[in-house]
Amino acid sequence: MKNIAAYHFLRCCAIMGLSGVIAVRILCFGDSNTYGYDPRGFFGDRYGAKDRWVDLLSKQTGHECINAGANGREIPRNPYALPLLTEQQEVDIFLVMLGTNNLLQGATAKEVATSMEIFLTPLLPRCKQILLVAPPPMKRGAWVPTDELVAESICLAEEYKLLAEKLNIPFVDTRHWNIEPTFDGVHFTESGHHVFAEKLGKELHL
């Protein structure tokens, strides 16, 4: 199967008896790029719903996409400490896209993948379906001063791919999506959010 993420997603829908008529609930758990952070203001701001990928994906597909992004979030150490994750029985897909802030704090791609494995493993029996998404690679900018940091962000996708295979969960690789970052090299531009939503929807065949 060429598109593994789409295969797992559609298989999940079939198992749960879901179809295009019934909306699927997708919890999008991530950092500031899921939240929709706009770094252009002095204290930062948030893009409007029409320019955030979670809201765009919901409008594009007709499915309920819940924005559970938070600025500065790293991979949680203890999933049971998060009230949001104790209600997974009400969510059909748990989409997680984290790791960028771990890299910015000095972790390597391998270390980030290890943290993600520790986070996801206890969630496996509690979630109907987990979808692991590799964050788009960073680019040189105000927050990304070295090529080494860019390289680690590129390597993260490969580490996540291996992890997804190990955990037998679907994986989406965004390395070649060319998501446009702002001046800081990290956060999506408004157009970047639109491209991300479009490509993710196609990846999942939504």
Residue ranges and their predicted role:
Residues 4-5, 13, 18-70, 82-90, ...:
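Serine-esterase "nucleophile elbow" of acetyl-processing enzymes
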